[in-house]
Amino acid sequence: CAEWTADEMRRIGIPEVELIETPGHPIVYGQWLGAEGAPTVLFYGHYDVQPVDPLDLWESPPFEATIRNGEIYARGAADDKGQVFMHLKAMEACLSRGERLPVNIKVVLEGEEEIGSVHLDSFIREQKERLAADVLVISDSPMFDRGVPSICYALRGLTYYQIDLQGTTQDLHSGSFGGAVANPAFVLAQVLAQMKDRSGRVKVPGFYDDVRVLSDDERVEFKKLPFSFP
């Protein structure tokens, strides 16, 4: 997949393309720097995909793109091969007519996003100067709705917590101890139930300390979208 993507980038007219080896899957890098004095846009995407299981639920082979009712069905059509291909086709539309792109373009496509981008950080550190750009476009987010152009400028983050519960160290007869001795499974359920209030707000102390509050302008713009937002 990495080799195919690199070949496709060369085919559409990107002059500098290479596969950069990592301890895992290679990173595809390409650049077109023919717009002297113009800003540089760095595109990021990934060519790896989620597993296809369960196969029996697929109506068509997952790695053979199929069009049904005007929709493309294939593994990666929405995450992230479809978005990557869209940007490449936009570049091709200009370059194939002999036109210059209005901005300089750099493209980074990795093959390990679905497993945590384990080698991307080291690649970025090693290639910091090479990756210098005026703006970064992450080609890995969904459309909001049909006919609604979207610029996704943030995603939800995540955090990890470990909860350790210690119960009895030996088996206890349920007829003698059931209900009298705390069951760690039920205690854990109670703990989890208390982590959020009825409105969904997290009750863990300090959870929101570094979370930026939505601005009034953002709320105004969100309310224009065709969905409800509290």
Model regions: which residues?
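N-terminal helical capping/dimerization or prosegment-like subdomains
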Residues: 1-55
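Generic secondary-structure signature for well-ordered alpha-helical cores
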Residues: 10-11, 96-99, 128-129, 168-170, ...
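Active-site metal-coordination/substrate-binding segment of hydrolases
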Residues: 38-109
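Active-site-proximal alpha-helical scaffold in enzymes
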Residues: 81-99, 117-125, 182-194
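Histidine/acidic-residue-rich, glycine-tolerant segments that coordinate divalent metal ions
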Residues: 99-183
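Acidic-enriched catalytic cores of C-N bond-cleaving enzymes acting on peptides and small amides
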Residues: 144, 153, 174-230
